[in-house]
Amino acid sequence: MNATTVRPEIELGPIRPPQRLAPYSYALGAEVKHAETAIIPERSEGDAFGRLILLHDPEGAEAWDGTMRLVAYIQADLDSTEAVDPLLPEVAWSWLVDALEQRAEHVTALGGTVTATTSVRYGDISGPPRAHQLELRASWTATDVELGPHVEAFCEVLEHAAGLPPTGVTDLGSRSRA
């Protein structure tokens, strides 16, 4: 999983995995670097970030339909027009399905949720008065021990959620985040 090459805008590295979900686990954290500085500020959750967790049970789990389960979580800030788009959940889910179909040989038991939220701050709370986020939670079973394509698919979904242009395309304007 660590040998995967991702876009330079994404910082990818190991994080502490959950300890009680399976006999073995490993996790990667990913965050999109801020375009203005090309770094991730120390006190930031980022415009888009996520984690990909590998759970392994050599005896398998019936609900997994296999021995290796991947669990993904992605959160990204949205602007107000994106947040109210009624097709946002379907489009965000299609990013994952398409990325897995293009990169991973075969997956089973794919499931998850897509949530768009709007938060309104009141009183003495710092931050913008309104904030909009997209959350994608998904899990699937890998049928092959080669996990690099799964990491690449996860990072591709993170790229879409962050609004990064496709690889090889230059963004002539910046997308506003509110």
Identify the role of each PLM range.
Residues M1-P18:
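Short, extreme N-terminal leader segments that mark the start of a protein/domain
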Residues S25-A27, D65-S80, R130-W140:
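Glycine-rich, often proline-containing surface loops adjacent to acidic residues and nearby aromatics
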Residues T37-I39, T81-D85, V145-H150:
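Short, conserved charged micro-motifs
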